[in-house]
């Protein structure tokens, strides 16, 4: 509406100011907008080309590659395997295990403490193999020698087989405290790992333990309907030839081959199993 003529200019100005102040008080204050220029200005301020210079890039790449390479080497070659059940399937028929013999169970099996890397990794001069039963518990790999069957010792109420003690003593003298290399093939039903075993009598002259036992007449070639393991046809032929020669010479357990009570280790175990089954059925 039009202002009355007697209204002064000061009143008009006051009204205008009041209306403006009231309207401005009703409006909500707006927060200042964040400028996305902050990050851009920061990133632009960094001299990224400095990191692409060969003097900085090459050492970084070399250091990263070295760390990754060292990790791979440790994981593949220097990581210790505590027990036979911890052996990765990728090892079987592909890799060998180096270790020190801690005990011999009977004529064809024993335990080793895995020493990955051998002397180059410090075993024997910087790192010691434990000797106490407490330290060795759950820390040794149980190995079954592949391709051979030694005469049985007395155990589980069963009698000892002829030449069982001789085979056991021979293996103790040949292996206890020695470094061996085992070419692993597969686990057996007793949580052992079946392997061809080489013992180091001298630094560069490994000896095939299974083959030597056959030559001495202290074991026969492993005979079973299933589960026989030699590591290949060539190895099997070598073992059978050694057994045939020992048999021909009448060495070890072959001395009494012509007698009526002669039994191979396989026949002895089969007879003992039949006796045990007969006892179970009678009870």
From Swiss-Prot:
Ca(2+) binds at residue 149. Belongs to the LCL3 family. Keywords: Calcium, Endonuclease, Hydrolase, Membrane, Metal-binding, Mitochondrion, Nuclease, Transmembrane, Transmembrane helix. SUPFAM superfamilies: Staphylococcal nuclease (SSF50199). It is an enzyme of class 3 (hydrolase). It is a single-pass membrane protein. It comes from Arthroderma gypseum (strain ATCC MYA-4604 / CBS 118893). The active site is at 144, 152, 192. The gene is LCL3. Residues 95-256 form the TNase-like domain. The keyword GTP-binding does not apply. Its EC number is 3.1.-.-. GO terms for molecular function: endonuclease activity; metal ion binding. This is Probable endonuclease LCL3. Its main location: mitochondrion. GO terms for cellular component: membrane; mitochondrion. It is found in: Mitochondrion; Membrane. Residues 258-270 have a biased composition (Basic and acidic residues).
